[in-house]
Amino acid sequence: AQAGPSRAYERLGLPLGKYLGAIAVFRVTLVFAWYSSVVGWTLRYIFAPLDAAFWKDPAAFFSSVASGWQSALFAVITIVLTGLIVMFGIRKGIEPVVKYMMIALFGILIILVLRAVTLPGAIEGLRFYLIPDFSKLTPRVVLTAMAQAFFSCSLAGAPMVVYGSYLRKTDDTPVSAITTAFGDTTVAILAGFAIFPIALTFGISPKAGAGLLFVSLPHAFKQMIGGFFFATLFFILAFFAGLTSTVSMLEVSTEALLQYTNMSRKQAVALLVTIISLLAIPIALYGVIWNYARYFVLYSGPLVAILPPIALYWVYGAERALAEINNGAAIKLGKWFIYWGKYVYPAGILAAYLYNILG
């Protein structure tokens, strides 16, 4: 369809496609307003090792960063930085910046992994990470993992629709998809090699969630030789990872404005940065707006996720969709992919999202 969600669903013939696509765009915009706070924390933490309070009491330091003016300030800085990247478009802005960030991300991650696996208690962390306990493999774990994969790779999400619109007809779509999944999974696996040995070496629960990142790991860095250096690298890594997500979110909203208004890219980005900042500030300061918006984000998830496979495989036609996918592919996908796209893929999406909502 060579377009963002609203225009793409229209072109594919999905009834009310323009408005259903608008829901997807609005949802991503709300998520960005909230997520900018989290990414903003990682930006603030890049400079945290310079502050004595960070080392003295990590929990109190995180509390001061995660609420109040610091949270709002760094959320807005994150939004502005994201806007500056998106303002230059895919080819001149997003593509080169993300490419260099990914190179830096891999480099930093490898340094952290090498340090983590050479810690005295690293073997316990590696054992926890690599030896499976199949008694814990419940349906909930599987579906939660699926939901995480959908979010991480933006499967059935508006960002993937937008990024996919920039593919040329002759591009190898299957190879692009496999490369994306492989790269994402590789980073996730390497991150596990970096985090779990550190956590287990210093007696930190690997189930600590956000507290693991912002409270427990600083305790560990404090006890490590070169802790200042590795703490700084770690949070640069976390910020780069978060920024790649915010860039994709803002590009979705920007593309929608460009499709349906006469705005230039710079005007569209400037308007969106202003609006999202105005949403992000009260969210960061008081949690307002998000207390209500999160219900829309949660319950609209299955609808937004199921739209691409319905539009592509059911409305546009599975045979035609397969022909488009195979156009330019070195290795063609077989007829089996039709059944995957029409039945297995949508069922997996709905199961993961609905289980998380009902659970």
Regions found by a protein language model. Give the residues of each.
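Transmembrane helix-loop boundary segments of multi-pass membrane transporters
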Residues: A1, R7-L14, I23, W41, ...
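Juxtamembrane transmembrane-helix boundary signature
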Residues: A1-L14, S36, I198-S205, A311-A318
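Inter-helical loop and helix-membrane interface segments of multi-pass membrane transporters/permeases
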Residues: P5-I23, S36-R91, P120-L143, A208-F214, ...
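C-terminal membrane-solvent junction of multi-pass transporters and transport-like membrane proteins
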Residues: L20-V25, S67, Y260-V273, Y295-I357
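Membrane-helix boundary/coupling elements in multi-pass transport proteins
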Residues: R27-G40, G157-G164, T180, G209, ...
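Helix-loop-helix connectors at the membrane interface of multi-pass transporters/channels
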Residues: V39-A66, Y166-T170, V175, T179-V187, ...
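Loop-to-transmembrane helix boundary motifs in multi-pass membrane proteins
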Residues: G68-L73, G183-A191, F228-A231, F240-L243, ...
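Membrane-embedded translocation segments of transport machinery
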Residues: E95, K99-L243, Q267-A268
